[in-house]
């Protein structure tokens, strides 16, 4: 089996590096190895971020480097100088064992670990000379994120780096979804089009009021799947029909649900109501249909494929021109995360509002009378609902 290595993405020299791929292919270990080696060679420390406090407490925090210790990697990466790691007070210390089996640990840590949910508590602390920041498992299959999570993450990065620019930041996750608030923030709009082995970059350039231009580079790598190199020995345990999960584990396919497809043929005459769900990256058309005695919603995505000169991977983008051409401004309902006084504008499609027409979509969701053009349309709707349930003035 071939484990993941950072060699390809490091050639991009990006400020932010997204690494996604199948489970247990060595993504996290590759970053931990990089942190240890970089500290040994340059003295630059590592910073490891997890979403929740429970992810770093007790045994979970203490066992992070256990596999590397057992595999002799600490000894290998430090040319035999250190053999172990001690976890104390949310920091990691390299240690060596003498001939009498006595352990001695460094006084200064080589890495710190943080819980994003507790990020406000770190503001007054100092974390000098951090060269690598790793956010492990930044993406969740259940779409459950902290309120304003990306802002919390950026604030924590600010706390760690302070005024320096020596840190390289990595965000690592299994391919559980192609929808993530981090992809949106960092301009990664082509994730659903990527294939294992793809490596792409995005560059942001902005001018400060002083006229000085700042350029930030973002790279994303979709790891090659281990099946190309014989796979993992553990693949025998996942040779079952639950393709949604097993393919993510064995070959890195996105763990996307198989959403129900429409069993009926319909025409424009069958459409009784159209609801639009809008974000910067998504236009979903949800049409209430009546076919015979059956009433249901059909959801499709209004997009177009765009491939700019020099791009290796094209992007599916919302087709706003088509949206403006086909929507009925007087009759259609609109859902978005924006605040609006428009009486036909709403936020949460799972809630009925004063307008009686808004009861149809929540009822269809509860009764499972909803069908989708594609799995991607289903994922986009579920992701929007997860965001909309937290959207209110009180949550700002």
Predicted regions and their residues:
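Phosphate/NTP-binding elements of NTP-utilizing enzymes
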Residues: 1-396
